[in-house]
Amino acid sequence: MATSKAPKERLKNYKYRGKEMSLPRQQRIASSLQLRKTRKDEQVLKRRNIDLFSSDMVSQALVKEVNFTLDDIIQAVNSSDPILHFRATRAAREMISQENTPPLNLIIEAGLIPKLVDFLKATPHPKLQFEAAWVLTNIASGTSEQTRAVVKEGAIQPLIELLCSPHLTVSEQAVWALGNIAGDCAEFRDCVISNNAIPHLINLISKGIPITFLRNISWTLSNLCRNKDPYPSESAVRQMLPPLCQLLLHRDNEILADTCWALSYLTKGGKEYIHHVVTTGILPRLVELMTSSELSISIPCLHTIGNIVAGTDEQTQMAIDAGMLKVLGQVLKHPKTSIQVLAAWTMSNVAAGPRHQVEQLLCNLLPILVDLLRNAELKVQKEVVCTVINIATGASQDQLTLLAHSGILEPMLSLLSAPDLEVVIIVLDIISYLLQHIDNLQEKKRLYFQIEKFGGFEKIECLQHHHNISISNSALDIIEKYFCEDGDGDSLPGPGLRV
């Protein structure tokens, strides 16, 4: 509901103004100024390995030999025979690697996880280590409770030790398992980090590993950047940024997508985290990737840029200096609505900056802004009116006049009939702000007559009776202050009262 107070979290990555507004108006604007996501997070949180026979470490002959029941598996893993350990673990892996409804709880309830963790330490038997890591990977891909069962039995440290295995298939499977564990929650992420996983992951990147392995590492690094309450420690961030910068120069789309997601998670943490990211010199590459034809790349990249320009004025200027505004103009014309929404949200954050940044925005994007108000879908228009209120409440008189007469009024007044009440509230705030703060009397009269010309007066008059109290109060306030002649000489003449 537009009238409710906005939770603090909703504003964390959305800059807005309102210093000169009354507190109730600030609250109404604050409740609407957030990124309305058009989709769920598109990065995969956890991954389950369902390719039964991908490993060259396992012969097809052995596949035919595996006919274990769960009781057979339990008996075999508790034996002293390494061959039975391998065959039973492999059978368990096959059991939970089916595509639909894998029986993860059967393995957990059978008490197999402690044995599987022990098998991770079986250095003379890399095939057994591989199978055990695979089973734990798939269990950790399940619910948080299932992931906790893996962590509780001490799997993290031996998995990290396997990152140094001379067998790439073993170390890659360990990376995968750690990615699933880290992606579950901040607690498990920090457990992985505190056990010194990051340096081992970085070492693997420099070894010329296969592209599939590198994809797993980039995804695992992104999960180490993921989750909040708390965000990852700044020391961990400083460790991860050099390899992330290196991966951002890669040409593989999956690696680029996961790396951009990692950076979007970090920059969501506030100005300190943004500082660590922008001081790497990575902004020009991020600006370049804003126009990627791959949505899997452009979406997290736009999230990252939008988060950065929600930071300090200096951080925003660094993005502008990297050419972000010119590229943003291209992205705002993207045929996909979800991309336009992200780009318009980014634009609104720039609009909350100081006047010289507002000037740069107006020079680069004002015609596009007007066009979006006229022709875009409502969810895009919503971000654009947030941009307009941010521009207006920080603008100079010249900028305010330019904005008022740029062509925004007609499409903006049309939005007073929008079904989204937050949009209606923001548009009313914009109209009120323009009428109150344009100082030049002729410009103010010009604004008034334009509002009447485009049917704004009638729309605002009708909104006095709206069921939403914030809308009706705002509309009444505008009518009483600016469209009624009350004898004090301050209001402009309303319709039928002109002389």
From Swiss-Prot:
InterPro entries: ARM-like, ARM-type_fold, Arm_3, Armadillo, Importin-a_IBB, Importin-a_IBB_sf, Importin_alpha
Domain of life of the organism encoding this protein: Eukaryota
Pfam families: Arm, Arm_3, IBB
Main subcellular localisation: nucleus
Keywords tagged on the record: Nucleus, Protein transport, Repeat, Transport
Annotated coiled-coil segments of the chain: none
Ranges occupied by ARM repeats: 101-141, 144-183, 186-226, 229-268, 271-310, 313-352, 354-393, 397-436
Tissue specificity remark: Expressed predominantly in ovary. Isoform 1 is the predominant form.
Subunit field text: Binds to importin subunit beta-1/KPNB1 via the IBB domain; this complex dissociates in the presence of RAN-GTP. Shows a limited binding to the RB1 nuclear localization signal (NLS), but not to the SV40, nor NPM1 NLSs. Interacts with RSL1D1.
Protein name: Importin subunit alpha-8
Organism: Mus musculus
